[in-house]
Swiss-Prot record:
UniProt cross-references to PANTHER family, sorted A to Z: PROTEIN TOLB (PTHR36842:SF1), PROTEIN TOLB HOMOLOG (PTHR36842)
Protein name: Tol-Pal system protein TolB
Major subcellular site: periplasm
Family: Belongs to the TolB family.
Organism: Aromatoleum aromaticum (strain DSM 19018 / LMG 30748 / EbN1)
Keyword annotations from UniProtKB, A to Z: Cell cycle, Cell division, Periplasm, Signal
Length: 426
């Protein structure tokens, strides 16, 4: 049997596997590996934080610790208000190279003004600060923005804590497309169905998802606007309609159709118009991924006799082979800067996440598990979210692009698959 066709059937079979799922259950995150060198930072309580029903700084601390790049210096019950310069030498003596000072100011409308400043204790300088307005219910969203600020100031890269992830879970005959914060909290159901849901893909605006639903008793591609719940059919041609991926302009999608026989790549507008076939191949072409500059579409194909990754100009033209090591490399996903390619490779019989430097063509295997699938880069390119198996059930995991930081995200007694990491939207 054709190896890519076999893979498609295996993925569909995995989507049909049933384990119990509690609606609105949260993903729990276990840190299984951290960076070799972590930056020591202190995040004491904000002034007046006790007036909130739920805190802020505990979420900031959890975000930074989860990244694997920071170690937290305990400040006890010390409160450092945003209006004063803290004793930086004293904080430095506790072992922190940076410290965050903040205050909450209640407003007449029930909201809070949150002000904070970040200091470098070594150089005895202020690194910057912000003022944010929030309701008490927005404590977690505000905390994620603060953590992003700290992350960017101390690493030079944008943070990813205020982003969202999409994934699919299974409960008996019920499938749910879930949306959650990057830390697994605030999970919401975007779509529930008694038929499989696969291949969620975020639009660049972070407001829409494309996915494949089998509710019509066949795979059909939909685009779903999350704020309104409205959705429309993008591809419902004869045969299979699958593997949607957005162009960087947010106006077009690449999809895989079998309407003319084998699985082949097509591009069409997000409203379903303007269908254009990308190439003609005697084999199976599938799993497209657009490059961030919009110039290339990467995809999996067996056209050369084994499952490998190719790319084709988005404007049309001849395909070029990208992977050459091994005889099974599939599911290409480009880093946000376009410099790296994440994919699934078969290594000694194990399916693992690998990353290729597209300039040097050097490939590094990042995981040590055996049934990985569906890699998805964080919007800053630092982490890669993917699906794997643990204890006989599907879980999500994340690994840093250098392989040093590792996390596992799971739901108690639930099967979780098909992850997709949303874009930065601020």
């Amino acid at each position: 049997m054709n190896i890519l066709l076999s893979r498609f059937r295996l993925l569909l079979a995995a989507a049909l596997a049933a384990l119990s799922w509690g609606a609105q259950a949260q993903l729990s995150i276990e840190i299984t590996g951290a960076g070799a060198t972590r930056f020591p930072v202190a995040i004491p309580l904000f002034e007046n934080e006790g007036s909130l029903p739920r805190g802020i700084t505990d979420v900031v601390r959890a975000d930074l610790e989860r990244s694997g790049l920071f170690s937290l210096v305990d400040m006890g019950l010390v409160t450092l208000p945003a209006t004063a310069v803290p004793d930086l030498a004293g904080v430095r003596a506790r072992g922190a190279d940076a410290v965050l000072a903040g205050s909450l100011y209640p407003q007449a409308d029930g909201r809070y003004d949150v002000r904070f400043r970040l200091f470098d204790t070594q150089k005895q300088t202020e690194l910057g600060g912000l003022s944010l307005r929030m309701t008490p219910a927005q404590n977690r969203a505000t905390a994620h923005r603060i953590a992003d600020f700290v992350y960017e100031k101390l690493t030079g890269q944008p943070g990813y804590f205020a982003t969202r992830i999409a994934y699919v879970v299974k409960s008996g005959p019920r499938y749910e497309l879930q949306i959650a914060d990057a830390d697994g909290m605030n999970a919401q159901t975007a779509l529930a169905s008694r038929e499989p849901i696969i291949s969620p893909a975020w639009a660049p605006d972070g407001q829409r998802l494309a996915y494949v639903s089998f509710e019509a008793k066949k795979p059909v591609v939909y685009v779903h606007t999350l704020a309104t719940g409205q959705r429309h059919v993008v591809a419902n041609f004869k045969g299979s309609n699958s593997a949607p991926t957005w162009a960087p302009d947010g106006q077009r999608l690449a999809v895989v159709l079998t309407k003319d026989g084998q699985s082949q790549l097509y591009v069409l507008n997000a409203d379903g118009s303007g269908l254009r076939r990308m190439a003609t191949s005697p084999g199976i072409d599938t799993e497209p991924a657009w490059s961030p500059d919009g110039e290339w579409i990467y995809f999996s194909s067996d056209r050369g006799g084994s499952a490998q990754i190719y790319r084709i100009p988005a404007s049309g033209g001849s395909a070029q082979r990208v992977t050459f090591e091994g005889n099974y490399n599939v599911t290409p996903r480009l880093s946000p800067d376009g410099r790296s390619l994440a994919f699934i490779t078969r290594n000694n019989g194990r399916f693992q996440v690998a990353v290729m430097d597209l300039a040097t063509r050097q490939t590094t295997i990042l995981t040590d598990s055996s049934r990985d699938e569906s890699p998805s880069f964080a919007p800053n390119g630092r982490m890669i979210l993917y699906a794997t198996e643990s204890g006989g059930r599907g879980v999500l995991a994340a690994v840093s692009s250098d392989g040093r930081v590792k996390q596992r995200l799971s739901v108690q007694a639930a099967d979780v698959r098909e992850p997709s990491w949303g874009p930065l939207t601020r």
